[in-house]
Regions:
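N-terminal charged segments
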Residues: 1-55, 68, 73
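A short helix-loop-beta-strand connector motif used in the catalytic cores of GNAT acetyltransferases and
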Residues: 3-10, 58, 72, 84-86, ...
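A conserved beta-turn-beta hairpin within the catalytic core of GNAT-like acetyltransferases
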Residues: 25-32, 84, 169-177, 187
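Acyl-donor-binding surface of acyltransferase catalytic domains
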Residues: 40-115, 238-240
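Conserved acetyl-CoA-binding loop-helix of GNAT-fold acetyltransferases
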Residues: 42-51, 178-184, 188-205, 226
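Conserved GNAT acetyl-CoA-binding A-motif
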Residues: 56-65, 203-216
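Conserved active-site alpha-helix within GNAT-family acetyltransferase domains
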Residues: 69-83, 193, 217-234
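A conserved beta-strand-loop-helix scaffold within acyl/acetyltransferase catalytic domains
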Residues: 133-183
Length: 240
């Protein structure tokens, strides 16, 4: 996961932490550090990590699988960091995915044109309660991620964007499926499960061995389980 997080970002090794920085966004979810497995950071390591983000005017954050570095979590808490959230992580190994076809009347396609990419983004933004005025720069960023090996799918109903999802470029056999979204008028039809299955099949076919995602809640966990994902531990997010 460290290699995957570093893709497309600048990095700095700070003690036992790999700090990653987005080149074009201050979004906290795009700027975070990951401790080495079994890391036992000193207080000076934690101070240096805090400073690495503070001098860039970024929120100091870490994200990692809790069981891989329990001492790191404790050291951060002692230094005044706080747990933002704990998120269950689910995995779908090759051979475990369930084929779920698109529901009747639903078209699944890889977005290629600007219109298709924008349609996917609008559906995602709307589903997650964000403003749907998608700037051209976001369309181009998405296109660049696809050119760099990322994955995406757009769900349409009668030509209208209904939902979508993405997966990161595969790094060392690992990728994350994310952004699974369905607009309110099209929910409870099985579109979310079909989108997830489409992306999962695509990354497996491209050689991914470790495919993971983080469900937002119990309903999402149930949906992903239908596709073949199983619980694999918790991701912890901390910030200062």
């Amino acid at each position: 996961m460290r290699r995957a997080a570093a893709a497309g970002r600048s990095t700095e090794q700070v003690g036992p932490f790999l700090a990653t920085f987005s080149p074009d966004s201050a979004n906290p979810f795009l700027n975070y550090a990951i401790p080495d497995d079994g890391a036992q950071p000193s207080s000076s390591d934690v101070d240096a990590l805090t400073e690495a983000y503070a001098r860039r005017d970024l929120l100091p954050r870490v994200e990692f699988m809790a069981e891989t570095a329990p001492a790191a979590e404790q050291a951060l808490l002692v230094a005044g960091w706080s747990v933002e959230r704990r998120i269950p992580v689910m995995l779908c190994p090759p051979g475990s995915a369930v084929t779920i076809p698109a529901p009747a009347g639903v078209e699944l396609l890889v977005p290629g044109t600007d219109e298709e990419i924008r349609g996917m983004l609008v559906a995602q933004y709307e589903a997650f309660g964000e403003p749907t005025d998608v700037p051209d720069t976001e369309v181009e960023k998405t296109r660049e991620r696809l050119r760099a090996g990322g994955f995406a799918v757009l769900a349409r109903v009668a030509g209208e964007p209904a939902g979508g999802g993405v997966a990161e470029a595969i790094v060392d056999g690992t990728t994350e499926v994310a952004g699974i979204a369905v607009r309110e008028p099209y929910r409870r039809r099985g579109i979310g499960a079909a989108v997830t299955a489409f992306l999962t099949a695509a990354v497996h076919e491209a050689g991914a061995r470790t495919v993971f995602l983080t469900p937002a809640g119990v309903p999402e966990q149930r949906m992903y389980a239908r596709v073949g994902y199983a619980p694999a531990g918790d991701m912890v997010h901390l910030s200062r």
